[in-house]
Amino acid sequence: VLLTFPFTRLSYWVKNYTKGFQLLFKATPKLPDLLNMVNIQDATDPMNVKLGNSSLKNEMSYDVNLLFSSMNIARQRSQSLRLGYTYRANALAMGYSYDAHTGVRKYRADNVNGNWNASASYSFEQPLDKMKRLSFGTWTRVEYVNSVDLIGNSEGSDYQASRSSVQTTLLDETLKLDYKVGSSSTMGVKISAAWRNVDGKAMDFDHINAVDFNYGATVSFNLPWHIQVGTDLTMYSRRGYEGSSMNTDDLLWNARLSYTMLKGKLTWMLDGFDILGNLNNITRMVNAQGRTETFVNALPRYAILHVAYHFNMKPKKH
């Protein structure tokens, strides 16, 4: 049975919503796959045997977020602080065991407990000069994740999945500086870094202490004849991973050319992504269990043409 749980929000604002806080609570249920609850053994593939588990329970995810925000309209200054906590009860996981003598793998769905994460983030943005052309922004986030899952076991012929507990500490920081030239042109620079520390209790767990960082610049300006040009150049780098394929440097260049006609109603836009062709179509990342996952993107470099038409429809007067 799947019950519906309400979404709760408590808010308090002062001075025309320029200062205040919000408390958000959400409970999200998740049903297990009914096929996994059928207590039978599926040996259609004799080397990969699926076992049923009639005692599976519903997964419940509880999210609590507290948000403080403040805005000074005259100085165009804004700042916010967010605190978050998530707990997953009876999380659904797929475990397996491997018999080294026969080569048979047995797997089934189970419930695990102990998955939770806590986070805090702070953002701040404000102009630095009286003309409000030069603005500074920063965003900071720290997060701790306790991930519990099931991993394979190669001892014996019976199903014996093992519990895997992995702790991850994340620290992100982003700094940006933007400058307005006139009323329609802007330029800016940005630098961002994310430190990741992953540790597990298993004897064969490979500790991870790595940094992902990027830095670059953006420019957008208007040309005569209703032409607009925008471009950004960013270097994406990763350091500290054990595998050399994870420690990479990728220079990404994107650009957009747009043309407006019919008094601003019709806009043609041509976007170019990864113009230099430096991105690899294979992406590697580390998940919450400290394992490397590989994804393949078939179209890393492309150009696309957009057409947008803007119109207003006024209701008829009766």
Question: Language-model segments: what does each one mean?
Answer:
Residues 1-318:
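Exposed, low-structure sequence patches enriched in small/polar residues
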